Amino acid sequence: MFNLIRKSTEWGGKTLVLESGKIARQANGAVVVTYGGTTVLSTVVAGKAKEPVDFLPLTVQFVAKSYAVGKIPGGFLKREGKPSDRETLISRLIDRSIRPLFPSGFYDEVSIVCNLLSYDTVTPPEVTALIGATAALAISGVPFNGMVVGARVGYLLSEDKYLLNASADEMLSSSLDLFLSGNKDSVLMVESEASELSESQMLGAISFGHQNCQEVIKLIEEFREESGILPFGFIPHDITSLVDDIASSYTESFSIAYSNIVKKERVLELEKLRDQVLSDMLAKYEQPNGNLQCQYSSQDIISALKSFERSLVRSKIIETSSRIDGRAFNGIRDIEIEIDVLPKTHGSALFTRGNTQALVVTALGTPQDEQIVDDLDGDRRENFLLHYNFPPYAVGESAALRAPGRREIGHGKLAWKAIRYVLPEKSDFPYTIRVVSEITESDGSSSMATVCGASLALMDTGVPIKAPVAGIAMGLIKEGEKFIILSDILGDEDHLGDMDFKVAGTSSGITALQMDMKISGISIEVIEKSLLQAKDGRMHILDKMNLVIQESRECIKNHAPRIESIFINKDKIRNVIGSGGKNIREICEKTGARVEIMQDGTVMIYAINNDAVEYAKNMIMDIVSEPEIGKVFDGTVIEIVKFGAFVSFLGGKRGLIHISEIKNEHINAVGSVISVNDKVKVLVIGIDREYVQLSMRRVDQETGEPIDGELYNIRKTNSDSDDSFLSSGSVNNRHGSEKKRRGSGRSRRSSGGSSYHRDDLHNNGFGNGNRSFNDNRNGNEVPRKPRFF
């Protein structure tokens, strides 16, 4: 029933298996790839384009379902919705890797779906999916020039060792995360983030990855041979004569238009010329009988015009060594930089390079603002967000605003990779950071303008980044064996060239790299020269940025939120929260701050100003602090009793001011001096296992300073000892007769027992006229553990 084809090999320490003929047999090509414990079903379906087009309508979708890791989706519907950012990014990786290998002029619809069936959270799914897409194309019959394989490369800096398809845990210690795709002869696509690695280290990673792809390329070739399926015949429509006809009539006009360095004017001139060419060529090639059939269709004319323009610009650059805007090959456009351009934002920068402009804005938030990512590798929280927006007006188009597309997600992720390494550790800067790049003008390299603008905006905000980051986009014009590398490419140079090579980094090294090809790959030699030329351009841009701001501001702006983190004993968390959240609510209501308590005892305090942060911090520290003898605290009288007053202090702790410690002179009734809810300053003069002894008379109630600056060295006693303050001995004594308790108390007083040394009292000036804490001058007995404690 099944015509099963199976091939396998060992690659990167794991088994790689290709299978077809059993699943999804209605597709033009379907391959199940299992690499380690990760399985992907890749399918290819091709058909005629629904409408005449002059481009390849290729659609690539990577789909990751929760069942692949044995999970049920969250939410009400319990079903996957729109593609996640990770699915979108992997789809782009596959698309960018295979698109250059379709033959020129092939405009049939091609749909590739890579469905993640099983995931071991170890083997990179993007590697498995690209292998599956290539193998499915190989047996689909769709014209496809060669095999392309992807590899994920890591780098252990301490060991100078490259890693192939390492697990997520292994990549934690890696200084590099690079995904590369290549065919037998060249590299097609690179996407990476790094921790300030040198050009030679990055080049070594690319070379290492490309070499390791060869084994799998050979396996796919053997797999295709065993299937016996060959690509169906494709003969592109010959439009050579049409290209020559356009060139003979319009070369001068287009040369003049492309010489205009003002993009807006250049675009308008080119649009008029294109409309004229289309009109003239349709009229010229219309059949004599007057029907609408032409020897060449409008799509043929558009394709021929694109081919003509591409050849015109490329030949001008190569023959005259002059670019569209007159710059040298390594020239950088004029740069203008402004920071702090928006008054009420937490940080902002306007970065303009030629006709490309990015307005980048930062916002600071609390850990509650972190992005919760529901990923197959496990839920995680992101405290750094970077969003890239590309509105239609940036290129002079009239169109409705839409949700971020694949391109915007991809460009934002590249800038995120470029910036992430230089951000401070969360323990040093606990804010959630959001950076938004609004592209207000675009003429090439808007993602790298975002990188520069983000670095400037972060420094303007006061985020202590390790170093400024700049980015540059490189281009390539390749004719035969001759090639020219262009620095800081324009949009037209990107469109008509062969490569878009983006490099971002600090003065010390590369933090992100992305390479896309429009031809079937480039050699390691071209990549090396591109990296070195990009370094010169990056340094030039960093110099321009340093003229405006060299390092982060010392502090965040006044209108930015304040966050402070403190650590408390985990056992004290319940005290801070309080019964039913009473304490934490009181803190938030009184201070206006927001307080977050982590399980490890980290307390995050968020407020709009420093005063509120300090107020909340002091309230929390009062709750978790322990009273110390000799320390003065603010307290509130909560109860008046015959023998003294009970005071609440340190966030709810209770202490007793004996009547003898209220004033230096004799008082008949406590209520004649203080009342409930009175605010008092008290000195801790004794600590028991359960009780705290307080004094008012020894503290200046105005200044809060101990009288005469004296600190009392009072002995901390055990609550069960005979001379312990408010000690009743055993539990049985507590429940004895009142007569017995009073007798016991008088016995202690007559024996001179005290909760502190009498010698200490004498030494501290209490020997003459000053009475001990147990003194009975007011005729009151010292209570033995009151029941309401």
Swiss-Prot record:
Subcellular location: Cytoplasm
Domain S1 motif: from-to ranges: 630-697
InterPro entries: ExoRNase_PH_dom1, ExoRNase_PH_dom2, ExoRNase_PH_dom2_sf, KH_dom, KH_dom_type_1, KH_dom_type_1_sf, NA-bd_OB-fold, PNPase
E.C. designation(s): 2.7.7.8
KH domain sequence ranges: 561-620
Pfam family, one: RNase_PH
PROSITE patterns reported in the protein's UniProt record: KH_TYPE_1 (PS50084), S1 (PS50126)
Chain residues that bind Mg(2+): D494, D500
Listed CDD domains: KH-I_PNPase (cd02393), RNase_PH_PNPase_2 (cd11364)
GO-annotated molecular function: 3'-5'-RNA exonuclease activity; magnesium ion binding; polyribonucleotide nucleotidyltransferase activity; RNA binding
Main location as per UniProt: cytoplasm
Compositional bias ranges of the Low complexity kind: 763-780
Co-factor(s): Mg(2+)
Chain intervals with Basic residues compositional bias: 737-749
A GO CC term assigned to this protein in UniProt: cytosol
HAMAP family: PNPase
Protein's job: Involved in mRNA degradation. Catalyzes the phosphorolysis of single-stranded polyribonucleotides processively in the 3'- to 5'-direction.
Family: Belongs to the polyribonucleotide nucleotidyltransferase family.
Protein's name according to its UniProt entry: Polyribonucleotide nucleotidyltransferase
Organism: Ehrlichia ruminantium (strain Welgevonden)
Gene expressing this chain: pnp
